[in-house]
Amino acid sequence: MGVAAWRRAARTSAGAMIVALAVGCGSDSTGPDVLDNGSMSAKIDGASWSATTAIAATYNSNILGIAGTDAAGRSVGFGAAVSAPGTFTIAVTSPANGLVNEAGKAWQAAGAVGSGTITITAISATGAKGTFQFTAAPVAGTGATGNKVVTEGVFDVTF
């Protein structure tokens, strides 16, 4: 693997790890009221979804990770390397990714798997807002099948 390919893989893996951690930490019922972190909603396969149980958001060293969970335990998250507002494409050469988790089954858009965009309209040391949409492929070994299509995603979060 060449140096450029290794760097792309490392950035994508780091972003995916941030999203996974945010999704996992977002459902901690013993922690603070993370709904104070803002709002997040989207459509998953055409059905409305809203983070009603937990929202976790982090921004450190220009890496943004945001995830939310609804009352049924369905989680949506995404991450990207962000230093300023803009649109970030989920693709092989991009350190951006998206994730859906339902009942332990996982779908991911990262690198060569899936596609989509994350648009950051505002970002600061205290919060971020924007939109997201992606098509996520099933993660092997989780029991997930078919793709998950996330559209009309909107977020407004604080860190």
Across the structure, where does each feature detected by a protein language model lie?
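Bacterial N-terminal signal peptides that target proteins for export
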Residues: 1-14
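C-terminal motif of bacterial Sec signal peptides marking the signal peptidase cleavage site
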Residues: 21-24
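Bacterial signal peptide processing site
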Residues: 26-29
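Short acidic, Pro/Gly- and aromatic-enriched capping/linker segments at domain boundaries
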Residues: 31-38
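A short, structural micro-pattern
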Residues: 36, 72, 149-151
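Surface-exposed helix/loop patches within compact recognition domains
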Residues: 40-43, 48, 54-127, 137
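C-terminal or internal capping secondary-structure element at the end of a domain, subdomain, or sheet
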Residues: 119-159
